[in-house]
Amino acid sequence: MYEQEKKMLAEAAIKQVKNGMILGLGTGSTTRSFIDALGEWVKAGGEVQGVATSNETVEQAKRLNIPLLSLEEATHIDLVIDGIDQIDPRFRVLKGGGGALFREKVVALMSREILYLADASKFVHHLTGPLPVEIDAFARPYVERYLRDKQLDVTLREHDGQPFVTDGGHLILDVDLERVQDVRHFAQELKSLTGVLETGYFERQPDHVLTVEQGKVRQLAHPNLRDGGGLV
């Protein structure tokens, strides 16, 4: 996504923020742009509290003097604002490219409303992945063998030539979904495996998605919502 588009989405997302809200703050490059904008909003006198989904987000929020709550301290979460990896016409979503899928999913499940930010490339007819699968390191051989027995392409996520390790101390396997017919069922199947903590298929779908079309920010509403979205 171009930096200008990220900035446009961040500015549009700020319009959804109200004084007194508790916000779920996602992880990733698109969300970083929003948190930068939120920092300016707080600096100008806005009052919110955030629940961060990663150590990276905690550090950024602290630098910008955005007040944070732990998950235990948050009585509720009003709105999650985060990025996505893929979304299909039924608003089924893949996330976890930034490596924070488990915490992002917990925060999303606790939130009253979800707003995702996405450029046009994130919209697909079918979810093709890769699907991030967060696993305990000890279970890696077992889970990899299970997936390869299904003729699926599996890649251990790396960072700087070493296995990527999540904030929770786990590994991530990225699974190609080209041969998977039913992603929801497949994600549930994976969750039943010993050693699998979570997958990047999000059962809780967003209420709205902000995207950029022809140089303008557009808000898309979940198919089950009555408001049809529109230009922001």
From Swiss-Prot:
Q: Which residues form the active site?
A: 104 (proton acceptor)
- EC main group: isomerase
Binding positions for substrate per the UniProt entry: 27-30, 82-85, 95-98, 122
Please name the CDD domains in this protein's record: RPI_A
Pathway in which the depicted protein is active: Carbohydrate degradation; pentose phosphate pathway; D-ribose 5-phosphate from D-ribulose 5-phosphate (non-oxidative stage): step 1/1
List GO BP terms, alphabetically: D-ribose metabolic process; pentose-phosphate shunt, non-oxidative branch
Where along the sequence do coiled-coil regions lie?
A: none
Q: Name one GO cellular component term.
A: cytosol
Which of UniProt's keywords are assigned here?
A: Isomerase
Annotated GO molecular function terms are: ribose-5-phosphate isomerase activity
Q: Which reaction does it catalyse?
A: aldehydo-D-ribose 5-phosphate = D-ribulose 5-phosphate
> Membrane-crossing residues?
none
Quote the EC number: 5.3.1.6
InterPro entries membership: NagB/RpiA_transferase-like, Ribose5P_isomerase_typA_subgr, Ribose5P_isomerase_type_A
UniProt record similarity statement: Belongs to the ribose 5-phosphate isomerase family.
Read off the NCBIfam families from this record: PRK00702.1, rpiA
Q: Subunit structure of this entry?
A: Homodimer.
Name-wise, this protein is Ribose-5-phosphate isomerase A
**What organism does this protein naturally occur in?**
Exiguobacterium sibiricum (strain DSM 17290 / CCUG 55495 / CIP 109462 / JCM 13490 / 255-15)
